[in-house]
Amino acid sequence: MGLAGAQERAGRPLAAEFLPEVEEVLAERGEPPYRLRQVYAALAGSLASGWDEVASLPKGLREELAGRVPASVLELRRISRARDGTRKYLFFTRDGHAIETVMIPERSRRTVCISTQVGCPMACTFCATGLLGIKRNLKAREIAEQVFAVARDIAPERVTNVVVMGMGEPFLNYRETLRALRVLNDRRGFNLAARHIAVSTSGLVDKIRRFADEPEQFHLAISLHTPFEEERRRLMPVAARHPIPELMNAARYYVERTRRKLFFEYTLLAGVNDRMRHAEALAELLDHPLYHLNLLRFNWTDTGFSATSARRAKEFLRRARELGLSATLRPSRGQDIEAACGQLAARDARSPTAR
């Protein structure tokens, strides 16, 4: 949807929702409405990181904004670089919380994996982020600015894809997450096509249905990790509230409502969920032409689990495909800097600043 969720569903303009402090300053000064659009275009479109870069504003207004409203709400403290080209960004919020973001280079693609919460309350037993607990939700600017900062860092290369698969459960911060994604999608903002943006959830059924009803064509991924109910409850506490039959009803609603492919994430844990009976049960559970299984070998965290061998993972993939499943085995990226899936925990938040 071009005009940002029909201007936040016919409410306030997206620029005002995204920049309420700026809107307040402009209103106090009696500035014309187009000033807010200029600021929004400069920060979200041109990626200005300071008020002195917003040349479209009068000098006096730039000076007042500089004294009252931060041009950026995140401080980039550290960039770590992996051998495979992956980059991990350590940011601090203005109230001192650490969050992490990852950029994954693949041929012609540059994918940014962003966070939506400080920590995560879901407590998935194999995920380092879940060990942190939850501090607070991120605001829309804090979510979107992760992408802006990465875009500035990798220029002249461009961010081609955004995945909401970093720290936190995005559907527990639904409003701010959707607002940030609309800024990223908005042609007056970051101008990234909706089909290049994907959100991952641990399986909040009511929000899956709500997401299916949104006008934008964002993609969705559901963290599944096992087809067996009791095992899923042990791995993912959320399963106690949203059992697999309920989850699959929501999944069916999503694909029938949107006619878009639905991705299921599956982390292979050695001796836990990597047996052939799991592949066979998955083939029965994911029996829909729009379902796709993304397999990923476990990335080390100090949670007591270990990774399925590469050979076993390939056998699992082959069996799943033999049974008719659309499935992919995704490579792990950035493991040597703890930037891979499930590893984000801001462990180096107290390390010296480095670039």
Curated annotation (Swiss-Prot):
Pfam families to which the protein is assigned, alphabetical: Radical_SAM (PF04055)
Cofactor note: Binds 1 [4Fe-4S] cluster. The cluster is coordinated with 3 cysteines and an exchangeable S-adenosyl-L-methionine.
Domain of life: Bacteria
GO cellular component: cytoplasm
EC number: 2.1.1.192
Disulfide bonds: 113-341
Broadest EC class assigned to this enzyme: transferase
Required cofactor(s): [4Fe-4S] cluster
Active site, UniProt feature: 100, 341
Reactions the enzyme catalyzes: adenosine(2503) in 23S rRNA + 2 reduced [2Fe-2S]-[ferredoxin] + 2 S-adenosyl-L-methionine = 2-methyladenosine(2503) in 23S rRNA + 5'-deoxyadenosine + L-methionine + 2 oxidized [2Fe-2S]-[ferredoxin] + S-adenosyl-L-homocysteine; adenosine(37) in tRNA + 2 reduced [2Fe-2S]-[ferredoxin] + 2 S-adenosyl-L-methionine = 2-methyladenosine(37) in tRNA + 5'-deoxyadenosine + L-methionine + 2 oxidized [2Fe-2S]-[ferredoxin] + S-adenosyl-L-homocysteine
CDD domains for this protein: Radical_SAM
Positions with a binding annotation for [4Fe-4S] cluster: 120, 124, 127
Stretches assigned to the Radical SAM core domain: 106-326
Keywords, sorted A to Z: 4Fe-4S, Cytoplasm, Disulfide bond, Iron, Iron-sulfur, Metal-binding, Methyltransferase, rRNA processing, S-adenosyl-L-methionine, Transferase, tRNA processing
Main localization (coarse): cytoplasm
Binding site for S-adenosyl-L-methionine: 168-169, 200, 223-225, 299
Localization per record: Cytoplasm
Function of the protein: Specifically methylates position 2 of adenine 2503 in 23S rRNA and position 2 of adenine 37 in tRNAs.
Additional remark text: Reaction proceeds by a ping-pong mechanism involving intermediate methylation of a conserved cysteine residue.
Family to which this protein belongs: Belongs to the radical SAM superfamily. RlmN family.
Protein name: Probable dual-specificity RNA methyltransferase RlmN
